[in-house]
Amino acid sequence: MALVLQGCGQPAQEQQAPADNEQRISAAYGSWVSPLGAAEVYGSASAIGELQSVGDAIYFSESSPAEGGKVGIKRLEKDGSITSVVAPAFGIGSRVHEYGGGDFLGIGQSLFVTKGQDQLFYRIAPNQEALALTPNGTRHGECISYPKGSRIICVREDHRQPGEPKASLVTINLNFSGEGDIFVDGHDFISSPAINADNTQLAWITWEHPNMPWDNTQLWLGDLNRKGQLTNIRQIAPERKGALMQPLFSPNGVLYFIADYDNWWNLYRLDAKGDIEQVTQLKAEIGGPAWKLGQHAYAFENENTLIASFNKEGDAGLLRLDLQTGVIEVLAADFADIKQVVQGADGVYFVGSRPTPERGIYKVSGRGTELVYAPKICGLDPRYISRAVNVEFTTKGGDKAHGYFYPPVNGDYQPLPDTRPPLLMMLHGGPTASANRAYDSAIQYWTSRGFAVFELNYRGSTGFGRQYRQSLYGNWGKADVEDAVWAAGFLVDQGWVNAEKLAIRGGSAGGLSVLSALAFHDKFKAGVSYFGISDIEVLGKETHKFESRYLDQLIGPYPEMKAVYRERSPLYHLQGFNEPLLLLQGLEDKVVPPSQSQHIYKALKDKGVPTAFIGIEGEGHGFRQPHNKILALESELVFYGMVFDFTPAGTLPALKLDNAAALARPRQQAKLPE
């Protein structure tokens, strides 16, 4: 007997799994019965967000499926006990830059948090009502303690005036509501405040349009006088260009930071003369793109050593660095993802994920690396788990691209003779993001049903150095799509997948790649777009401040290159778009507005292409509520069954596919929008 479901919020069910020498059920790929349902994938699995050391405890944020994905705060004591401090119903979550981060700060017995619903910044203290400290129309995040005058320093985004919101560093009084005092302003974006141990120096990061924080940023340093005023403000090494991030003072007051001066994000420090000294020379990345505030890729154990996470081509590890000798000791290299590295009272803590279901909060101490808290996760018996195969392939022009291949695995089934599995080509968003090989129930949902999955790290992904990351600049909607097409061809040539059952799916920027692949190429036979981009020109006019000039890098300056924007927009090139498409869209999306999906849906529907649109009320950019995630995943399965002619197992929602009768019939030309 095998326990096929573990930690899914319900008792595991015993199911007889055949031994290797027993007869397995022969069935079509895609129709296999899986022990992992969509409700198990999204209905009970929680996710850890940020860590922070407060006194002898570690505070961490965690989402709650039972509360519709809302986020609360828990406390991890040294003895391993867990206490809920802020209930998920409160719903913490900053929306600075829309993506948020840096949602809470602990000081003594009090917590200071941003509430997701109203974006006010609250003080939560024992036996007291929550007190809002900030005015309406402002958003705060990434706060740090500043003992002078009982204040804290926060990143603020001010939305109270027309036009773009204003960025600043402000001080907030901990005891009463008020406007707060501006410490630093005058820049398009500000992040990452850090203060030294004796509260005499403050460091921070800024960047200006059209840069993103992974392009070119500036590191600043200022002195704090006895009155708490910021003086002697200077930029560190203004002559050197790079993406600098995560400044942090060592216990003895030396300023460290991460920069990609040598193509890779490595550690640097400011020496006694004020010169920059490179501390690590890894051909790997310490840290990642700052989509959110409050990221921590390293922490100091003491004055002599630090612990840092690193990423190499999608795999993650942990190292200890001797600050005097420069000697590096690799503590772990078997992780798929590591984030939120913080110094606690009894060791360094971090959030880690592995290729196996084991994930959670880990501690590094004299006893080694140990898992100290694991949230609920839907684990599977190994007989149902697909393991990633690291793939490097040659793409158009002879360049190399990367990805992870997951073959179909189900201990109860075998495929029909002489068949190959359908492929789901999965594209991450960003496009400055990356796929890794962390155990993901959403991937196992597909592989345990008989699908092959390929997670593509197309040119532009992180984890491969600055040059690879910027190879997409000027080529977005082209190079990423070419990589997907060439990856599919590689997998077909290897005999791993069925050439007639190739599907491509992605969200946001990945959704653009999906639509472009179907509009400009004929490799894929179906596509699924989650809040994808169909009109790049309109996106640049409608999106929020943080990404409003991102397209200057990805495409080129507008309106000078207006023609290229239209050339790359799938909405205007539907003549060759003939394959079925499913569109899923949050109707409150502020990053990629619903019109991006609605317009291409109407054009394809009018053309006669089999097309479905699911607009979801109450959801923004990325679905948060478990029941909506479940609906999307199950609808996607139904869609593939209709397109690839198999019957999925289980009770699934009905899907209205317009022009379903035309699945095998030539389509007519679409009407272009006026």
What spans do the regions from the language model cover?
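A short beta-strand motif characteristic of beta-propeller blades
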Residues: 36-42, 83-94, 129-134, 179-184, ...
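Non-catalytic accessory segments flanking enzyme active sites
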Residues: 47-50, 61-62, 71-73, 83-84, ...
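Cap/lid segment of the alpha/beta-hydrolase catalytic domain
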Residues: 160, 210, 375-500, 507, ...
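Active-site-proximal cap/loop segments of hydrolase catalytic domains
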Residues: 458-674
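Short loop/turn segments that connect beta-strands within beta-propeller blades
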Residues: 77-80, 125-128, 173-177, 224-227, ...
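Conserved beta-propeller blade repeats
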Residues: 43-57, 91-109, 137-152, 185-203, ...
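C-terminal motif of bacterial Sec signal peptides marking the signal peptidase cleavage site
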Residues: 6-7
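A flexible loop/linker signature enriched in serine peptidases of the S9 family
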Residues: 62-72, 92-98, 113-121, 135-140, ...
